[in-house]
């Protein structure tokens, strides 16, 4: 059973991101575009709550149901919401093209109803040695966000 979701990102960064999962246990494909980003890497995460009443700040911390430390998408020890960085070339829209085996659109730990947040700075993937490295990747301000919703198949 294919499941699809969509997220419209608003803020200084804007864009649309699509999620697709072929079935339970299958990886989730994340595709789309984000505009309004300075050249360089920008942290890209799923945060716990689908609440944007106070802008991106009310979306809470990274989605982390297993209480792990922050890490890279390829790390075993990472938040479920840790999707690494997207890379802006400073000229036109920034593509999003991620395939992740830990997030899901199905079951109790589904990311549907949670918030995607784009950050101002690079995510150091938990390896930067900064006091925020193991919680946020020291990725800086939240410059764009949107709630992930169910999409028509």
UniProtKB/Swiss-Prot annotation:
<comment type="similarity">
    <text>Belongs to the Cu-Zn superoxide dismutase family.</text>
</comment>
<dbReference type="InterPro" id="IPR018152">
    <property type="entry name" value="SOD_Cu/Zn_BS"/>
</dbReference>
<keyword id="KW-0049">Antioxidant</keyword>
<protein>
    <recommendedName>
        <fullName>Superoxide dismutase [Cu-Zn]</fullName>
        <ecNumber>1.15.1.1</ecNumber>
    </recommendedName>
</protein>
<dbReference type="GO" id="GO:0005777">
    <property type="term" value="C:peroxisome"/>
</dbReference>
<dbReference type="GO" id="GO:1901526">
    <property type="term" value="P:positive regulation of mitophagy"/>
</dbReference>
<dbReference type="GO" id="GO:0004784">
    <property type="term" value="F:superoxide dismutase activity"/>
</dbReference>
<comment type="function">
    <text>Destroys radicals which are normally produced within the cells and which are toxic to biological systems.</text>
</comment>
<feature type="binding site">
    <location>
        <position position="70"/>
    </location>
    <ligand>
        <name>Zn(2+)</name>
    </ligand>
</feature>
<feature type="binding site">
    <location>
        <position position="62"/>
    </location>
    <ligand>
        <name>Zn(2+)</name>
    </ligand>
</feature>
<dbReference type="InterPro" id="IPR001424">
    <property type="entry name" value="SOD_Cu_Zn_dom"/>
</dbReference>
<keyword id="KW-0479">Metal-binding</keyword>
<dbReference type="GO" id="GO:0048167">
    <property type="term" value="P:regulation of synaptic plasticity"/>
</dbReference>
<dbReference type="GO" id="GO:0008340">
    <property type="term" value="P:determination of adult lifespan"/>
</dbReference>
<feature type="binding site">
    <location>
        <position position="79"/>
    </location>
    <ligand>
        <name>Zn(2+)</name>
    </ligand>
</feature>
<keyword id="KW-1015">Disulfide bond</keyword>
<dbReference type="GO" id="GO:0005507">
    <property type="term" value="F:copper ion binding"/>
</dbReference>
<keyword id="KW-0560">Oxidoreductase</keyword>
<feature type="binding site">
    <location>
        <position position="45"/>
    </location>
    <ligand>
        <name>Cu cation</name>
    </ligand>
</feature>
<feature type="binding site">
    <location>
        <position position="47"/>
    </location>
    <ligand>
        <name>Cu cation</name>
    </ligand>
</feature>
<feature type="binding site">
    <location>
        <position position="119"/>
    </location>
    <ligand>
        <name>Cu cation</name>
    </ligand>
</feature>
<keyword id="KW-0862">Zinc</keyword>
<keyword id="KW-0963">Cytoplasm</keyword>
<feature type="binding site">
    <location>
        <position position="62"/>
    </location>
    <ligand>
        <name>Cu cation</name>
    </ligand>
</feature>
<dbReference type="InterPro" id="IPR036423">
    <property type="entry name" value="SOD-like_Cu/Zn_dom_sf"/>
</dbReference>
<dbReference type="InterPro" id="IPR024134">
    <property type="entry name" value="SOD_Cu/Zn_/chaperone"/>
</dbReference>
<feature type="disulfide bond">
    <location>
        <begin position="56"/>
        <end position="145"/>
    </location>
</feature>
<feature type="binding site">
    <location>
        <position position="82"/>
    </location>
    <ligand>
        <name>Zn(2+)</name>
    </ligand>
</feature>
<keyword id="KW-0186">Copper</keyword>
<dbReference type="Pfam" id="PF00080">
    <property type="entry name" value="Sod_Cu"/>
</dbReference>
<dbReference type="GO" id="GO:0042803">
    <property type="term" value="F:protein homodimerization activity"/>
</dbReference>
<comment type="subunit">
    <text>Homodimer.</text>
</comment>
């Amino acid at each position: 059973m294919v499941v699809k979701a969509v997220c419209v990102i608003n803020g200084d960064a804007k864009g649309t991101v699509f999620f697709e999962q072929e079935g339970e246990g299958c990886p989730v494909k994340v595709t789309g575009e984000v505009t309004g980003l300075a050249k360089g890497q920008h942290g890209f995460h799923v945060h716990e709550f689908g609440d944007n009443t106070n802008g991106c700040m009310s979306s809470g911390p990274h989605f982390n149901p297993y209480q792990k430390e922050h890490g890279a998408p390829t790390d075993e020890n990472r938040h479920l919401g840790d999707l690494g960085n997207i890379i802006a070339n400073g000229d036109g829209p920034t593509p999003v093209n991620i395939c992740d085996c830990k997030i899901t659109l199905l079951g109790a730990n589904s990311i549907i109803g949670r918030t995607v947040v784009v950050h101002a700075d690079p995510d150091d993937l938990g390896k930067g040695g900064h006091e925020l490295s193991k919680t946020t990747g020291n990725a800086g301000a939240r410059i764009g966000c949107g709630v992930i919703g169910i999409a028509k198949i």
